[in-house]
Amino acid sequence: MAQNNAVAGFNALNGVELSLFTTDELKAIHYATMEVLMNPGVQVSDPEARQIFKENGCEVDEKTSIVKIPEYLVRRALQLAPSRFVLWGRDKKYNTVQEAGGKVHWTCFGTGVKMCKYQDGKYVTVDSVEQDIADIAKLCDWAENIDYFSLPVSARDWAGKGAQDVHETLTPIANTAKHYHHIDPVGEHVDYYRDIVKAYYGGDEEEARKKPIFSMLLCPTSPLELSVNACQVIIRGARFGMPVNVLSMAMSGGSSPVYLAGTLVTHNAEVLSGIVLAQLTVPGAKVWYGSSTTTFDLKKGTAPVGSPELGLISAAVAKLAQFYGLPSYVAGTOSDAKIPDNQAGHEKTMTCLLPALAGANTIYGAGMLELGMTFSMEQLVIDNDIIKMVKKAMQGIPVSPETLAVESIQKVGIGNNFLALKQTRMLVDYPSSPMLIDRRMFGDWAASGSKDLAAVANEKVQDILKNHQVPPVDADILKDMQAIVDKADRAFKEG
């Protein structure tokens, strides 16, 4: 239920909070998860990961690759995992704290494979390329309500031609001063990522560990599997001091039970198994509790991300992460619409607001369309407005002697207005004030060209791409970073 005057995830003491579960219900999900981790357990495809589990007391069947994780190891891992860590930006003013029970932050969606391009009021979809990543990074650098950058689309122009994921590492770092979260890393290439970050710090690995400008995301395979790639991202990320996001993408009714509570059980087992592996590898490794879990539309045969179920699951995951004392990273601001239209606005607001009120530490989805397949730069700048308005709603209605304003009411008296009051003029920024969403009357809107929101957003996108300046990486350092990408490309071509 919604409660007024509760501590919100956003920086407000009198905000609105979504409680969602009782403590007993959270415990019930936890204990059900502990049963599942022992029976049937989790299939772990990576031999190195199985050995780590085995050496630390797990029952491991090498024939089936099934690992059974006892509750005491889960509890130990939760004690070791930090409840707070900092995501560093190239510019420290963009440093972002991820903290269980702390502020809510937003990042863009990832990872799509297409771009929705706006051209003279019409839309076309094309494969995403490396330049799209650079352009979106620049937009996110500008967007005041996007706190850090997540890989939004794939550099498909490099698919089969070079080390695509390594290109997807350098390009964002060079095009935004905000922290970069790689959503599609390759386990065997984590060494390249480390070397790129080290090069940024002039070869100083200790500095790179202390001030991580780069982090990674991996997904268990639902139901109840950790792939070789997922394990290697966890293991190498932990060893190199990179924050790692263990994010399940279960689908209720498909790869998890049709009941959302049951889906939370398998989701929880998948994420906790990855977090346990991280802590067994390096105690104190920085980890998120992640979710892109949604429902499976049994009638349409799709996995919608603009659904109320996604918003509820993301809110539930935020509460589970708080229960465990872990920072959370969840899907939201999501839509199944194909273009920036009415459907997109409705679905994005709904899926943004629910996890925000639950106190999720990061909500990702800005810019995303078409069930997560497509990215729109126009939608990104619209979502920047939606997020701003959700932040305002999270603040609730603070009640204090100042905000009750009895003296102002008495001063103005009956039948007058408050516009001339000094207090009103001083608080001109107090009411919500979106940048693109239009609040004018019809006549004024028509006189300015009758432009719809997507057209206005397109103009804003073009202005940002032309005029926004991103602080550059030092030329010599960038050359060293590029040399690592070139090395990865040569290794790819040599096979």
Swiss-Prot record:
Catalytic activity: Co(I)-[trimethylamine-specific corrinoid protein] + trimethylamine + H(+) = methyl-Co(III)-[trimethylamine-specific corrinoid protein] + dimethylamine
InterPro entries (alphabetical): MttB-like_sf, MttB_Methanosar, MTTB_MeTrfase
Listed GO biological process terms: methanogenesis; methylation
Listed pathway(s): One-carbon metabolism; methanogenesis from trimethylamine
Enzyme class: transferase
Keywords carried by this UniProt record: Methanogenesis, Methyltransferase, Pyrrolysine, Transferase
Gene Ontology molecular functions: trimethylamine methyltransferase activity
Keyword Chaperone: no
EC number: 2.1.1.250
Keyword Methyltransferase annotated: yes
Pfam families assigned to the protein according to its UniProt record, in alphabetical order: MTTB
Function as written in the Swiss-Prot or TrEMBL entry: Catalyzes the transfer of a methyl group from trimethylamine to the corrinoid cofactor of MttC.
Cross-referenced NCBIfam families: trimeth_pyl
Family: Belongs to the trimethylamine methyltransferase family.
Quaternary state and interactors: Can form a complex with MttC.
Name of the protein this chain belongs to: Trimethylamine methyltransferase MttB2
